[in-house]
Each structure stands twice: as C-alpha cells, then as structure tokens.
C-alpha cells in the first residue's frame, strides 16, 4: 500500500509541476508579447530617475552669529517652474526636418508647412509631374488634383512607425509654385490625428509633415539620378567621329571627345571591329593591334560596312587635340590608310564607340 501511495503521490506531483510549468510558460509568452507591442522604450530616456524626487530650492539659513558673503546675482539659482513632460513621459526623439536631398535645394519648416526650394532650371522643368508620380508611387491616395495651379490634396495617409504605440493619420496639401528664380515645393499639413483624435502637438505635426516631404523628395532624387544616368549613357554612346587630315595632309579620324575618354574606350571599341590590342602606350598615344576582318553577319550586327582592310598587324596613333582627339591607322606596311579607307572607318568607329564602354 505504501509503495502504491508513493507512486501515486509522485505522479500527482509531476502533473502539478507540469501544469505549473505550462502556466509559467504561457504567462512568459504573454509578458513578452505585451512588451514587444509597447514601443515607449524607443521614445523614453533610460537611466536613474531619482532627480524627479529631488527637493525644491529653499532659502539659505545661516546659524546665529555667522555673517554670509554679500549676495552676488551671478551665482544665484533662479527659482522657476517647468512645464512639459518629464521622466518617462518625455519624448527624447530628435525633431524631424525636411532633408535637402535634391541637387541645389534648400529646405525650411514653418508652422505646419515644409518647403523645398529648387533652382528653376531645365532639370526641374517637369517638377510638378514628377511630384504627382512620387505621390502615386508611394501609394498616397490623391483626393483632389489641380494641374493648372499645380496643387493636390491627399486623402488620409496611414503612417506606420515602429516607435509609436498607436499610428498617426494625416492629410496634406502639396503644391509647386514659382518664387522669383526658384521653384517652391511645399507640403502643408491639413489634419493630423491619432486614434481618431486631432493632434495639435507642433512636434508631431513637424515629424509627420517632414516624413511626407522626405518621402516625396527621395523619389524625386531617384528620378534625377536615373535621368542623369540616362544622359551619361547617351553621352557615352554619342561620340561623334569625322574624317579629317593631319598637318601633312594624311587622312585621320577626328573624334569629338577628350583624349582620356577616347583612350579608355578604344580597346573595347577596337575589339568590336575585329582589332585585338597587343601593345599600348598611353603617354605616347600608340597602340598595336592585330586585325582579323569580321564576317558579314558581324558587320551587320555592328551596323557598319566592311572598310576593306587586309588582315595583319596595324599601328594606331592617338592625338590629343584638347577637347577632341585624332586617330591615325597605319597598315602592316607602315602606310597611312587611303582616303577611301579612312572615310570607311568613320562609320565603323562611330558604330564601335556607340556599342562600347570604357575598359
């Protein structure tokens, strides 16, 4: 009987411990879940708060018979009352501000509006259209749009910040106006609320107004970078090649690009036309190449006709003409190309440069 009782007692004890462990585990999970949803720690100062319990200032009382120094206002601690949040209620996040992300831009914030001032240049000619695209690409719903006056009003934008317990919603007026020689992109907060209650805190209005402005200008900055990249790529492809002559009257190719750019792009361009660089000297401007004519399909792909050069080893002299460069091909016998061959190489090198980048 004793043995059976001990066994039952052991099983009951084990069941009780298991139940307790489960309860503790569930409680711990609930506690962690509660902590993970409380974002106040991201806004609160950490450390000792004993200063909040410090006693206030009081008049200094000297013992009888002691003569105090003459009072000097320089060292006097002024008594005053402080208004605003303290301790854990104090929001330590720095104020948000509109960022000057765009080239040549200036930013400012006043009241409930942020403004980005831009140069009224060709680069910003389509500013309004790009602003509308930026709003749409950020999935900000447009409630009203007036292209004639370059003004739009958003519907409520649902902000989602990890440092907020309850998210904010805001409505904004976005406009582009000309101010003297500048363009002014302005974002005005029309309404800000949290849990369906109006928010009047200037810090919060500035925070979410700046967030809207920065979302727009970040998109505009990307548009500017993409546009500049396309222009750069276009310039890379659009090297103009013409036929010319040197001081002695021998035919050369004139490339309307600087020596450095031409030199950097020549190896790839020459490869496109069947010329393999075997040796080169940048200081002397010389290259040695071995030429093997392309087949008909390759010439068609390049977009140029066979210039009629024979196979063999050629020399290429590159000349620096300030903002232009010269190219002179010497055949395997050391002779300059004929005028007809040189003229044929104009289209060949024009096509080769357009399809090649720097090495």
UniProtKB/Swiss-Prot annotation:
It is found in: Cell outer membrane. A lipid is attached at residue 35 (N-palmitoyl cysteine). A lipid is attached at residue 35 (S-diacylglycerol cysteine). The keyword Lipoprotein applies. Keywords: Cell outer membrane, Lipoprotein, Membrane, Palmitate, Signal. InterPro entries: BamC, BamC_C, NlpB/DapX. Part of the outer membrane protein assembly complex, which is involved in assembly and insertion of beta-barrel proteins into the outer membrane. Belongs to the BamC family. NCBIfam families: PRK11679.1 (NF008674). This is Outer membrane protein assembly factor BamC. It comes from Rahnella sp. (strain Y9602). The lineage of its organism: Bacteria, Pseudomonadati, Pseudomonadota, Gammaproteobacteria, Enterobacterales.
């Amino acid at each position: 009987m004793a043995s059976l009782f001990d066994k039952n007692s052991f099983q009951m004890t084990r069941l009780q411990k298991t139940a307790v462990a489960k309860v503790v585990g569930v409680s711990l999970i609930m506690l962690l879940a509660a902590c993970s949803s409380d974002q106040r720690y991201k806004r609160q100062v950490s450390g000792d708060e004993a200063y909040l319990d410090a006693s206030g200032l009081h008049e200094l009382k000297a013992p009888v018979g002691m003569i105090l120094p003459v009072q000097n206002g320089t060292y006097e601690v002024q008594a005053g009352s402080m208004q605003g949040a303290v301790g854990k209620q104090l929001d330590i996040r720095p104020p948000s501000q509109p960022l000057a992300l765009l080239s040549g831009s200036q930013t400012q914030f006043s009241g409930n509006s942020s403004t980005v001032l831009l140069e009224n240049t060709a680069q910003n000619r389509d500013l309004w259209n790009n602003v509308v695209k930026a709003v749409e690409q950020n999935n900000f719903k447009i409630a009203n749009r007036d292209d004639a006056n370059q003004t739009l009003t958003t519907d409520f934008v649902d902000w989602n910040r990890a440092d907020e317990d309850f998210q904010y919603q805001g409505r904004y007026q976005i406009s582009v106006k000309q101010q003297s020689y500048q363009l002014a992109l302005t974002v005005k907060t029309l309404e800000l609320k949290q849990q369906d209650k109006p928010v009047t805190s200037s810090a919060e209005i500035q925070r979410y107004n700046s967030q809207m402005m920065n979302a727009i200008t970040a998109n505009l900055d990307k548009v500017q970078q993409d546009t500049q990249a396309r222009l750069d790529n276009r310039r890379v492809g659009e090297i103009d090649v013409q036929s010319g002559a040197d001081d002695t009257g021998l035919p050369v190719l004139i490339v309307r690009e600087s020596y450095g750019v031409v030199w950097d792009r020549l190896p790839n361009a020459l490869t496109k036309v069947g010329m393999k660089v075997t040796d080169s000297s940048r200081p002397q401007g010389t290259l040695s190449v071995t030429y093997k004519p392309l087949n008909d399909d390759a010439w068609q792909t390049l977009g140029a006709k066979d210039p009629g050069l024979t196979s063999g080893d050629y020399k290429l002299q590159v000349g620096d003409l300030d903002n232009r460069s010269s190219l002179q091909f010497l055949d395997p016998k050391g002779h300059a190309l004929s005028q007809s061959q040189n003229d044929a190489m104009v289209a060949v090198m024009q096509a080769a440069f357009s399809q090649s980048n720097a090495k």
